[in-house]
Amino acid sequence: MAGPIEQFAIKPIVELGEIGGQPVAFTNSALFMVLTVLGAAAFMFLSSRRGTVVPGRWQSSAEILYEFVSKTLRENAGEKGMAFFPLVFSLFLFILFANLIGMFPYAFTVTSHIIVTFALAMLVFLTVTIYGLVRHGFRFFRLFMPAGVPVVLAPIIVPIEIMSYISRPVSHSVRLFAVMLAGHITLKVFAGFVIGLGSLGTLGMLTAVLPLAMTVALTALELLMAVIQAYVFTMLTCMYLNDALHPSH
């Protein structure tokens, strides 16, 4: 049985040549990112192609997700934040589908790679920074001096706030990456226990009951975490967008 880390290996599927002496290939990671986008697009197409007053299952599911993200965005960024709804909803769907697809046997979890989650976090960071500077100009830098803080504390507070702001893409991306990585490793380890004990005969199969129960419980927990982490990433995105809209708050 393969080790618990091997499931995260990026493997080439189609070699595409070289650029600057470096090999270029269509990998399993790229394949599952494409499948994630296609899955999310298919879900939205099926749920919206026949809009009815009394929604069916597909339409109800899409409306629940729409209202959930819409409410989260309004609560954290205000009514003006709805201008960013397409971005926020797309991020939520991508992460949710990527996490759920990764739960299938032999599937690849793209959100277990820091390069993917960091790219998503940088997209949010650059959107917030560029929009904030374009909309507010130098007033955007009020973000680094919270309202009500005495001026005498500025030499201490401002550097701390700047470092906190710059480190956002790291904390934003590591949270999702670490949770998905740790969850899948744990599942793999317990599944390995079940297979290993089961191969020992009758006594081993009886002993494997506890690891099997743990594996089932961890699978349910990992499904829950797949949804929660999509929500957490989305909520933090909404909070950061609020800084671009209201830097003086």
Swiss-Prot record:
Protein species of origin: Brucella anthropi (strain ATCC 49188 / DSM 6882 / CCUG 24695 / JCM 21032 / LMG 3331 / NBRC 15819 / NCTC 12168 / Alc 37)
Function, in words: Key component of the proton channel; it plays a direct role in the translocation of protons across the membrane.
Protein name: ATP synthase subunit a 2
Signal peptide coordinates: none
Cellular component, GO, one term: plasma membrane
Keyword terms of this UniProt record: ATP synthesis, Cell inner membrane, Cell membrane, CF(0), Hydrogen ion transport, Ion transport, Membrane, Transmembrane, Transmembrane helix, Transport
Location relative to the cell: Cell inner membrane
Single GO MF annotation: proton-transporting ATP synthase activity, rotational mechanism
Subunit organization: F-type ATPases have 2 components, CF(1) - the catalytic core - and CF(0) - the membrane proton channel. CF(1) has five subunits: alpha(3), beta(3), gamma(1), delta(1), epsilon(1). CF(0) has three main subunits: a(1), b(2) and c(9-12). The alpha and beta chains form an alternating ring which encloses part of the gamma chain. CF(1) is attached to CF(0) by a central stalk formed by the gamma and epsilon chains, while a peripheral stalk is formed by the delta and b chains.
Transmembrane segments annotated in the record for this chain: 26-46, 84-104, 114-134, 143-163, 177-199, 216-236
Claim: Transmembrane is one of the keywords in the record: yes
Name of a matching Pfam family: ATP-synt_A
Entry's family note: Belongs to the ATPase A chain family.
Upper lineage: Bacteria, Pseudomonadati, Pseudomonadota, Alphaproteobacteria, Hyphomicrobiales
Membrane topology qualifier: Multi-pass membrane protein
UniProt KW Transmembrane helix keyword: yes
PANTHER family: ATP SYNTHASE SUBUNIT A
